[in-house]
Amino acid sequence: MQKQRFCLDTTAITDSDVRRSLGVSNISESAEKIMDIIAQARVQLDISCHIPYNTVYKELVGFLIREECAPETLIKVDTWLVKKTPNRYEIKIPAEIFYEYIKDLRERINKGMRISENAMYETALEAYILSKPDEKDREDVLNEVLSKTVNSFRDKYRNTLRGGTLDSAPDLDVLLLAKELDAAVVANDEGIEKWAQRLGLRFVNARDFPFILQEYLDLWDKK
């Protein structure tokens, strides 16, 4: 049987879907549960779980510290997750992938520009409508309109430019390290999933990951 390797994104430990699937209410509990399962899988089955260093590792540890996770959990992260920097100079990526990424990025930028233009038109129209009936104070009109429009703009702009694509160095490092190690990617991120598929990498949704490891362990115990 081929040695099983997994490459973890931060969401593999911290995502809310993971907590719900494990039936726990906070990140401290879910992180500890996941790390215990990872430790058992390593000791009993030689299944290794890797994390890109220092991008994803730093992101994960920072998140756990902010959530006031127990020091013991952080020690487990250091002990059972294999920290490795992707060999960015040696990993070969097909040129077609870069072409698709640039094309996708260009389309998103154009959509973002159209959203910006629409937001400006909506702001001007709302300001005109609000100021016309009773000639409201200029600052009140601007504050009322801008707060509403800016919030709407941020949501639309973020979803258009960042949803379903790689938007950070840690995201890219997860894919590069997984490709280098021939490991399955573990994440709950639409962009990582999409580009993992394009790179021909195995993908495991973060909420399913603990149960997959547990299934391996249960089968081993039955032997």
Curated annotation (Swiss-Prot):
Coiled coil stretches, renumbered: none
Source organism, top-level taxon: Archaea
Keywords: Endonuclease, Hydrolase, Nuclease, tRNA processing
Gene Ontology annotations of biological process type: tRNA 5'-leader removal
MF term (GO), any: ribonuclease P activity
EC number: 3.1.26.5
Keyword Methyltransferase part of the UniProt annotation: no
Reactions performed catalytically: Endonucleolytic cleavage of RNA, removing 5'-extranucleotides from tRNA precursor
InterPro entries tied to this protein: RNA_free_RNase_P (IPR014856)
Catalytic EC class: hydrolase
Disulfide bonds: none
Role description: RNA-free RNase P that catalyzes the removal of the 5'-leader sequence from pre-tRNA to produce the mature 5'-terminus.
Entry-linked NCBIfam families: PRK04358.1-1 (NF003340), PRK04358.1-4 (NF003343), RNA_lig_partner (TIGR03875)
Family label: Belongs to the HARP family.
Protein name, per record: RNA-free ribonuclease P
Species of origin: Methanococcus maripaludis (strain C7 / ATCC BAA-1331)
